[in-house]
Amino acid sequence: MKKVLLYIFIFICTLFFNIWVYADTTLELKEPVIVFDKIAHYGLQGYTVAKDKLFVVLEGYDDTKSIIKVFDLNTYKEILSYEYGSLGHANDVTYNSKNNKIYVIASSGSDKVFIFNGDTFKYEKTIRIGLPVRSITYIEDYDRYAVRLIGTGYLYKNDFTLVSKFPFIVGMNLSSEVGRQGWTYYKGLIYYANWSWVSQGGTGTNALFIYDLDGNKYTSIYTDESIGEIEGVDFYNNKMILGFNGYDKKIKFYVSDIPSVEKETKNQEIIKKEAVIVKKKNYEVYIIIGIVSILVIIILVIILRHKKKVIK
């Protein structure tokens, strides 16, 4: 009987520990470093870090106009803002540090990419790359681009010819409830921002799904879901920059430490999903597990005592 109770105790402790550990992978974001009121009929879409500047695209709701904003990442002050014509949905933006160009993708089924100067932040030209990409990131280590369609990703050379006609990643989040946002390469991994689309039946959860360049899923990092819809992720000075369309009608950018990333097993991925539920429901799962565990122990004790009496 003592052994049975010991095993039960170890099981419960392990379960609680795993839930506690993985619930803590939700980033606790502090005050935003950049915040401004939404401009009528415009919302945050893509953005990128260009040297020490943050290049931001606000997309008009009818896709016919856009606003470009540029912020100094050392002071977080706005240094440029101007209205521009259509950049499509402008779902993602990336910066090529080798040619000093900024690339804005039209998205929404288009293969157009708009190129801006990395010093003046002014439009230069439009190119077509052959695929209707929805996310883009420049991979400085290999002088390539990684692009995402819906659930697949391809690699382009620096002249926007395909490295291979086969995708390097397949089967990414295909749920209709998921709002797929921008992605960014950082130190060997791609960080892919997603939002659980409320109007499509989602929960409003914000997440970063992390992959390597072989298409292997590493882990998931969850962010504060009360802020608003996450639009992308980028990096500066070994910190993560997260941008949101806030539920309070403000556009916000947060700076966060980068969590350590290790490749997760399937079991860990399941535990993480449960951990998100725990956080979302104010730890109701803790209470339920506790009650069930206590009931199991009581029932086992009663059964064992009854058997002992029968033997006597």
Predicted regions and their residues:
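Loop/turn-rich, solvent-exposed surfaces of beta-rich toroidal or solenoidal domains
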Residues: 173-213
